[in-house]
Amino acid sequence: MYILGLSAMGHDSAAALLGDSGIVAAMEESKLARTRASEGIPREAIRYCLERAGIRWRDVVYVAIASRPWRAWQRQASFRARLAPLAPVSSGYFVNKASGELGRELNNVRIVRQMAGAPEGRVESLDHHLCHAASAFYASAFERALVVSLDEKGDGRAGFVGIGEGTGLREVQSLTLPHSLAWVYSQVTKLLGFRPHADEHKTQWLSICGEGGGDADSGAAAVKGAAAGAPSVAAGAPAFTELFLEMLRREPRGPAHLNAKYFRSGFAGELSFTHEFYRRAGIAQEPAENTPETRVPEPLRVRIATGLQRACEIILCEWLTALREEFKERSLCLAGGLYLNPLLVAAIEARVGFENVFVQPAAGNEGTALGAAYYLWHRQCGRARIAAMPGPYWGPAYSNEEIKKVLDNCKAAYHWCDSDEGKLGEAVRLLQAGKIMAWFQGAAEFGPRALGARSLLASPWAPYVKENLNDYVKHRESFRPFALAIPEERCGEYFECSPNGRFLTTMAKANGAGRRLLEGLPPGFLLHGNLVRLHVVHAADNPLFWKLLNRAGENAPAPLLVNTSFNLFGEPLVVTPRDAVRSYFCSGADALVAGNFLLEKR
């Protein structure tokens, strides 16, 4: 039996296929269509899933769509009705806009029904947050857990709290708009000059720059002054933490309750800030024709980002602690775009007190495709619980013959390695020489992170490794840290890391030996509080990458490699051999190992 799950209504569309053996295939549309944050029906991802299973539409018993358009419209309409007295001019615009979105989404459901050939392949629409929650609980190894989903406004609400037990998943709390931490995080991201719904990770890493910086005493004084009517709290990050805590007033039934003193509804229905926020933050009122970067000076950007991150950690940790005490659960499952924040996940693991925490690696909207399929599999079909998610490698894989056809077509010069050992030896030679190596092996990752199948690798001991990666390959902001990869068996020698390090969804902490090791590396790998971005590689998940790490560590202080995503700036992760060749030749990478083929630039 096969069930196809789809994220087909908002950004980050994707498809996932479940069969009797478990997950068969899963892939984001953006990686196959080569566009960022693809929306709508994931036609290429659907085609891939069916091809990987060797089936046709008629073999799919159910199609599960991770959205309920009518229910989302009703929630949005109710939300806007409550806001109408505050923004009467925009209410009519919103009704037209929401009605247009509803029409498009209902049309997408109709098209999927036609593609599936219903009634042979039945199509079910499921709640967005329910699918997030299902993607986390059913992929975990827990028999019972508290399950929490938080994102911006999926299907017209901010979040979901449920209890998962066996094959069951029931809702115990619904979080309503506009009280959405993720929504606020996106709007602050926009304020800082980044793209909302795309660059929230930049806000997160910018916040690290403010940790340990600034003067806590002057920040506290600024808060006291602001309470007395002073014009600004811009003296330091602690002051902004207090400001955001005031803006995101905590209340018992949710992680936040937005203070209307600081928020307003824009003409198009988006969340925006009031004049009072700009006054308290010490920045100019938002002009109609300007960019945030010209408005917010760099020191303020860091303090705002740091204050927001700290406030979110405080609010969520206190709320999740209250939920743990209320429901008496020992395990926690998390999904939703807000949990793509490893700093936040690490804070939850350290402070909340759950014995076990699992974060769905594809925590964004793409993961709802998997959750929709999981939910129908267990609840609609009554099938037994599928084993815990065995890894993220559910995308396309390519044979050496397929790779060779592309290389020959591109007239690329290459060297053939006749065994895995030979390939590993060549790769280690390149890494020890300080080269940046593109690594294209096996099935592509499902989810936003490169986990050793579509990666750019380098030795962390190579001179100027961060500068070379940033300037010649990634072309990204210098404040963003790179991840390190280490074999699971060696991790405990240097780091403390939860099982979520397997998917790069949390932060590790360097112990004494780890601090001494990383202090010998260029700045930026060891972060404030001894935190490290760490990919813990299990031999069962990715045996070839695990072997490479161990081989690379034979003549190095430790089996560590820098691991970052293999893609050009502004593009999704590479998937196909042609993607890999194009990205390799258009970047400053020194070498490409694709299958058993080695390409080097001279």
Model-derived regions: residue spans:
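Short HxH-centered metal-ligating active-site micro-motif
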Residues: 44-53, 63-67, 548, 556
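Short beta-strand-loop/turn "lid" adjacent to the catalytic site in phosphate-handling enzymes
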Residues: 56-109, 134-135
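Short acidic-aromatic active-site loops that bind/stabilize oxyanions
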Residues: 98-102, 123-126, 294, 298-314, ...
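N-terminal phosphate-binding loop and adjacent alpha-helix
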Residues: 31-55
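Phosphate/ATP-binding catalytic cores across multiple sugar-kinase/actin-like superfamilies
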Residues: 306-332
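Phosphate/pyrophosphate-binding loops at sites that engage ATP/ADP/AMP, CoA/4′-phosphopantetheine
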Residues: 47-61, 116, 320-328
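Flexible beta->alpha loop and helix N-cap segments adjacent to enzyme active/binding sites
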Residues: 2, 8-28, 33-36, 86-88, ...
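Conserved residues at the C-terminal ends of beta-strands
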Residues: 63-66, 335, 360, 595
